[in-house]
């Protein structure tokens, strides 16, 4: 299989440089944040309080809880970070529905006892990949946006220090760069399952989702190459491709999904290639 590409610096033309900077709290170790600012080519503000920042709309902010993406100014919503130990993902790890969870059903974990090799081609903050890894899947994750990649890498590092999470994180390998390039080079049957969750216009009104999507929209935008991702995924998956979509949204342009697993706000379109092993 091809080696993953690495891309840690924002493009020179990126407008993010005008709205995003890196800073840290008095309780955080500044070295990691300062190195990140250098790698990404972003302005370094040192110790600041996000609500007092006026020149930038967003901060990559390191505090005692880890790295976060934080809107600035008075009244800004709280930080967005990759968190697997506590909060929603911690509760889901301890009390989740096992292989009956929607993403696990879509990947096919109720149909096979074989450990699946899954490529999460659009990893984001890694929540679905963490669920699948907690159920035994060997996960390869790609996140091409360097800001989101930094958040996810930090979350996985912190989780690796937790006794309960460390075995799960050991089944997750994160790469930077574009999964589309990797899939186009990988060839047939490179992985068992490819999982896609492209960015889409989100209409969920819950406060958490709204906060996360507001910030993500500024940093990532939409994935305009979703149909290309699907085509490449179908060319390198052994058993199936799974695409997460809003429940009422149309399928990605291309072949029609053969099956769907639906939840309250989202669904999983399934593109089978061959039957999963028993």
UniProtKB/Swiss-Prot annotation:
S-adenosyl-L-methionine binds at residues 143-144, 197. GO terms for cellular component: cytoplasm. It is an enzyme of class 2 (transferase). It comes from the Bacteria. Transmembrane segments: none annotated. Keywords: Cytoplasm, Methyltransferase, rRNA processing, S-adenosyl-L-methionine, Transferase. Pfam families: SAM_MT. InterPro entries: 16SrRNA_methylTrfase_J, SAM-dependent_MTases_sf. Its EC number is 2.1.1.242. It is found in: Cytoplasm. Its main location: cytoplasm. GO terms for molecular function: rRNA (guanine-N2-)-methyltransferase activity. Gene3D superfamilies: Vaccinia Virus protein VP39 (3.40.50.150). It catalyses: guanosine(1516) in 16S rRNA + S-adenosyl-L-methionine = N(2)-methylguanosine(1516) in 16S rRNA + S-adenosyl-L-homocysteine + H(+). PANTHER family: RIBOSOMAL RNA SMALL SUBUNIT METHYLTRANSFERASE J. Belongs to the methyltransferase superfamily. RsmJ family. HAMAP family: 16SrRNA_methyltr_J (MF_01523). Specifically methylates the guanosine in position 1516 of 16S rRNA. This is Ribosomal RNA small subunit methyltransferase J. It comes from Marinobacter nauticus (strain ATCC 700491 / DSM 11845 / VT8). The gene is rsmJ.
